[in-house]
Regions:
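Carboxylate/His-rich catalytic cores and anion/metal-binding grooves
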Residues: 168-177, 214-241
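Acidic/polar, glycine-enriched structural segments that form the non-catalytic walls/loops
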Residues: 1-205
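Long, K/E/R/D-enriched contiguous segments that form extended
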Residues: 186, 191-221, 235, 241
Length: 241
């Protein structure tokens, strides 16, 4: 069995996440794919959400969760398939899942795409409604166009951000990989946010922002994306005192 996957959070549409799977078997096989929305999210201090509500229809899954501080997070997703299958609901506590059962033929790949929209009360008063609208737009656009837009957006970003080092390809790759993370977590979508000490990859500081941002990250954005540098400084000004 060969599984090829792509997944990306859109650089130019911060609420959209896209996934694609291509599965090929070299034998006649009964195959089951389970996918959905997992609300059973924990951090090192315990469950991340205190309340969950979910819904499903023929094409979509949706879930809204509430944190201990009263913020709400809404996720709406839709699966698109290019093969005949039997769809079954799969119930688990705190999870909304769909089960797709099919028969594959040898060396005939099948494809599945999943488009997801995510909103919070930091973005809108009614995050579930806004996530639904955003998903409608991205479904109409389709995975292929989203992928093309993602590629174009990153190519444009790298025109001003890429670092070239003569004679040390490993160092150049490592440095640009770090810059990729900086560009990925930059708060482009709103005024007065910053970058947490662990970025998007750790829980230890629960999103806390230290002076590390100004000491180690600000210069990069000053030269590559001044609007982000301004946002980082506005956050600091807004939170002084």
């Amino acid at each position: 069995v060969t599984v090829e996957s792509e997944h990306f959070a859109k650089y130019d549409e911060q609420h959209i996440v896209c996934l694609s799977y291509r599965i090929t078997t070299d034998f006649h096989a009964d195959l089951e794919i389970v996918t959905g929305i997992d609300g059973d999210v924990w951090d090192i201090h315990g469950p991340h959400y205190i309340r969950l509500s979910g819904a499903r229809n023929e094409t979509r899954l949706s879930m809204e969760a509430e944190t201990g501080t009263g913020d709400r997070v809404a996720v709406v997703s839709q699966i698109q398939l290019d093969f005949p299958c039997e769809k079954k609901d799969k119930e688990q506590e705190k999870r909304l899942l769909d089960r797709y059962c099919m028969v594959t033929n040898a060396n005939e790949p099948i494809s599945l795409t999943k488009l997801t929209a995510i909103y919070t009360t930091k973005d809108a008063k009614a995050p579930l409604e806004e996530a639904g609208k955003a998903l409608e737009a991205v479904v109409e656009k389709g995975y292929a166009q989203c992928r093309s837009e993602q590629q174009e957006a990153w190519e444009e970003a790298w025109k001003t951000a890429e670092v070239e080092i003569d004679g040390d390809d490993e160092a150049m790759e490592a440095l640009n990989y770090s810059l990729y993370h900086l560009m990925s977590i930059a708060p482009r979508h709103t005024r007065g946010l910053s970058i947490g000490a662990r970025g998007l990859s750790g829980q230890t500081y629960k999103g806390a922002v230290f002076w590390d941002t100004e000491m180690f990250m600000l210069d990069f954005f000053l030269y590559t994306d001044p609007a982000v540098a301004k946002t980082l400084l506005e956050y600091r000004i807004d939170t002084l005192g």
